[in-house]
């Protein structure tokens, strides 16, 4: 039964028994599944969605290593099998879902207005460009994913930008990325977006992201480099939107790094200005809302639009993810990139490569650091400490200037399985076969090598 006044069904302990939940209109099934465990969710009646993406009726979805929720607007029955850390049913008193739906309706009207006037070529109007900001654990990513899913259900093709290097949108952590979403997302994937592009088949249409390499976890580790990467992805996005009226009229949804009280607003302002944002959404962060409102009051972006700053409350369904959980997520994404997941098994290629055939770059140490943001230096000899690191393969020539290499798009990633310093050889794991010396490789500072993929 519900707890009086809260509309909550008490949390149940971890269980592997089959059970059924009946969701009344606007109720949510909230659950947490650890890495190594899994649950299977089947919608047996009604309609329900995970972060905006609808579940198909009588289709079993298996999820592992997630903290998430299933929302039903009109009522549903869910059949659950497997082990959860905890689970509960909540609602319908969480006003955040209604606020999110109202925001979507406003954005959709803006998209439709832009689409009606998109016959003017590159000068045609843009759809809404929305930046979502807030502290760690406020639900930024969940809101962006939900808005993107709802947009695709109307036939729109929004550009989704992940400016938070801590996770990775359809790619590995330590990157900034962007992708056009015009088809359904993968309900069963850990992040809810889908898997990174690979050489294997996919049950859900694959999205091909634009990826740029930061190689650090937090913005404050190298603000100048981070801003330079933002500039690079902004240029690539602008070119993509200029050539595609459907993408331009659908607008943009931007997930941002977590706001740190007192020192994070300048980065958010830089992102907003570079990507010509006209709507900023702050979640449960009054001080940030006040600062951004003051900063953009009376200010127009380069497209001549005023910038609106909107405050939303945090959903009660947002679950905290601790450091251990996030580390497991990062490790899982790396394993999945090379080896696939439970649904698709991939067979990466292992090569023994002469070090001198490769062009591997890294950032200079702090004491030698160039004044130029994003400086790189070529590594002159194989280093044993490179073992078990993931290197970014850049879309550039090996002898291009370091600045051009650093801010080039990423073509893919390789994994250093072993380093033989004496013989000057390296054992490299790559998702596809091919020469590795044709593209420069960049060795970042994160994600750190917590796992041995071949061990």
Swiss-Prot record:
Cellular localisation: Nucleus
Lineage: Eukaryota, Fungi, Dikarya, Ascomycota, Pezizomycotina
Subunit structure, as described in the record: Component of a pre-mRNA cleavage factor complex. Interacts directly with PCF11.
Positions annotated to bind ATP: 28, 67, 137-142
Protein name, UniProt field: mRNA cleavage and polyadenylation factor CLP1
Region of interest (Disordered), ranges: 112-131
GO BP: mRNA 3'-end processing; tRNA splicing, via endonucleolytic cleavage and ligation
GO cellular component terms given for this protein: mRNA cleavage factor complex
MF term (GO), any: polynucleotide 5'-hydroxyl-kinase activity
Job description of the protein: Required for endonucleolytic cleavage during polyadenylation-dependent pre-mRNA 3'-end formation.
């Amino acid at each position: 039964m519900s707890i009086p006044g809260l509309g909550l069904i008490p949390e149940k302990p971890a269980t592997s028994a089959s059970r059924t939940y009946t969701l009344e209109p606007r109720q949510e099934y909230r659950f947490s599944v650890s890495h190594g465990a899994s649950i299977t969710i089947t919608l047996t009646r009604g309609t329900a969605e995970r972060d905006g993406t609808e579940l198909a009726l009588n289709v079993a979805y298996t999820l592992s290593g997630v903290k998430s929720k299933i929302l039903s607007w009109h009522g549903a029955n869910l059949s659950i099998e497997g082990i959860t850390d905890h689970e509960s049913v909540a609602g319908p008193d969480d006003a955040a879902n209604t606020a999110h739906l109202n925001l979507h309706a406003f954005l959709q009207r803006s998209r439709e207005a832009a689409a009606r006037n998109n016959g003017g070529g590159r000068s045609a109007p843009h759809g809404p460009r929305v930046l979502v900001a807030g502290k760690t654990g406020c639900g930024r990513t969940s809101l962006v994913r939900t808005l993107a899913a709802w947009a695709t259900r109307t036939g729109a093709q929004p550009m989704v930008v992940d400016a938070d290097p801590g996770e990775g949108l359809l790619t590995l952590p330590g990157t900034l990325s962007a992708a056009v979403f015009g088809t359904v997302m993968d309900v069963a994937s850990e992040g809810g977006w889908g898997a990174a592009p690979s050489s294997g088949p996919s049950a859900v249409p694959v999205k091909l992201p634009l990826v740029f390499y930061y190689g650090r976890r937090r913005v404050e580790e190298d603000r100048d480099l981070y801003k330079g990467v933002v500039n690079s992805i902004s240029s690539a996005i602008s070119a993509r939107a200029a050539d595609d009226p459907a993408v331009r009229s659908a607008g943009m949804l931007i997930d941002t790094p977590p706001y740190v009280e007192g020192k994070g607003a300048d980065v958010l302002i830089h992102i907003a200005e570079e990507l010509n944002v006209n709507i900023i959404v702050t979640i449960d962060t009054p001080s940030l809302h006040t600062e951004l409102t003051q900063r953009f009051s009376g200010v127009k972006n380069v497209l001549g639009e005023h910038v609106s700053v909107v405050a939303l409350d945090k959903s009660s369904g947002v679950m905290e993810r601790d450091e251990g959980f996030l580390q497991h997520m990062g490790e899982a994404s790396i394993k999945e990139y090379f080896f696939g997941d439970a649904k698709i098994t991939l067979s990466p290629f292992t090569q023994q490569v002469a070090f001198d055939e490769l062009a591997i770059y890294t950032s200079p140490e702090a004491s030698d650091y160039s004044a130029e943001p994003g400086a790189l230096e070529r590594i002159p000899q194989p280093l044993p400490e490179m073992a078990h690191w993931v290197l970014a393969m850049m879309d550039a020539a090996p002898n291009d200037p370091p600045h051009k290499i650093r801010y080039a798009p990423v073509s893919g990633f390789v994994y250093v399985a072993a380093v033989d310093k004496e013989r000057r050889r390296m054992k490299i794991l790559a998702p596809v076969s091919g020469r590795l010396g044709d593209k420069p490789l960049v060795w970042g500072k994160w994600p750190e090598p917590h796992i041995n993929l071949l061990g």
